[in-house]
């Protein structure tokens, strides 16, 4: 087991290095840069800036310096604000983490409940309604849902105030972020629950006269949650990456996104 974990960790580190190298070198192939000639900057000023940010050095050397600074906690300085990027992220990550954490909890709780209901009412009205809405949830991107929620509930109906730094409202961003993982967990729970209910140990428990609720919650649901637990990791990654887009639509300048100007 320890050898397997070490192997997986080493592969993860290797993957990160490969992805970072590819991203770095591809970005350097793109024409232009932060101090290109399109800006009203003299050649002397451009040269000073390039020396300051090590852009005058060969690209392989730039990458080595970049990784060395990164490993030492130096993430560089933001060209927009002039402040340290690590400080900027730590200051603004709280809002993104709060939205993502609440969205993940909501998605898991509601998804498991709806999936269980759909499994227990298979081919009946509740099951069909749940299948319909989960299909919408998996088909609609989070940024589209965030835009629709903002237009309907904030601008058209005026039921919910638009996000501001003085009056934050987490409801719509949380709904938009939780919609897809909640729908996926619902379908995952339903499939796992139906499979668990058809197992021999469930039939044995029923034959022994075990109460129906005990069979469902103690035996069937406990085993049906195993696939849901394995999905938590990818779900958190999805929510954190999607939160930047959703926040850019729903939230003001206090979120963890770069300025659009």
List the model feature ranges, each with a label.
Residues 56-112:
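An internal, D/E-rich "acidic patch" concept
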Residues 23, 27, 31, 118-119, ...:
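Membrane-water interface at transmembrane helix exits
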Residues 131-183:
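Generic hydrophobic transmembrane alpha-helix motif, especially the helices
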Residues 9, 45, 49, 59-75, ...:
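Hydrophobic alpha-helical segments of integral membrane proteins
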Residues 257-261:
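A short, hydrophobic C-terminal helix/tail in secreted or cell-surface proteins
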Residues 2-3, 90-126, 142, 165-256:
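Alpha-helical transmembrane segments of integral membrane proteins
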Residues 9, 13-26, 101, 105-109, ...:
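Generic alpha-helical transmembrane segments of integral inner-membrane proteins
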Residues 15-64, 158-172:
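Hydrophobic alpha-helical transmembrane segments of membrane transport/permease proteins
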């Amino acid at each position: 087991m320890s050898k397997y974990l070490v192997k997986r960790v080493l592969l993860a580190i290797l993957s990160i290095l490969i992805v970072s190298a590819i991203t770095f070198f591809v970005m350097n192939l793109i024409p232009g840069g932060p101090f290109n000639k399109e800006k009203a900057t003299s050649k002397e000023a451009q040269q000073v800036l390039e020396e300051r940010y090590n852009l005058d050095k060969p690209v392989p050397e730039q990458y080595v310096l970049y990784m060395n600074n990164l490993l030492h906690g130096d993430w560089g300085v933001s060209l927009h604000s002039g402040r340290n990027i690590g400080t900027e992220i730590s200051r603004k990550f709280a809002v993104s983490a709060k939205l993502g954490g609440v969205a993940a909890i909501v998605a898991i709780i509601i998804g498991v409940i709806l999936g269980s209901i759909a499994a227990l009412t298979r081919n009946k009205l509740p099951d069909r309604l749940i299948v319909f809405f989960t299909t919408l949830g998996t088909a609609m991107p989070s940024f589209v849902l965030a835009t629709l929620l903002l237009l309907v509930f904030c601008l058209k109906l005026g039921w919910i105030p638009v996000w501001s730094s003085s009056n934050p409202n987490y409801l719509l961003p949380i709904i938009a972020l939780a919609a897809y993982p909640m729908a996926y967990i619902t379908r995952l729970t339903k499939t796992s629950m139906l499979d668990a209910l058809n197992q021999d140990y469930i039939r044995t428990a029923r034959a022994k006269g075990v109460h129906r609720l005990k069979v469902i919650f103690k035996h069937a649901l406990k085993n049906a949650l195993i696939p849901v637990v394995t999905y938590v990791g990818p779900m958190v990654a999805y929510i954190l990456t999607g939160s930047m887009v959703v926040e850019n639509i729903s939230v003001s300048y206090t979120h963890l996104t770069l300025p659009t100007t």
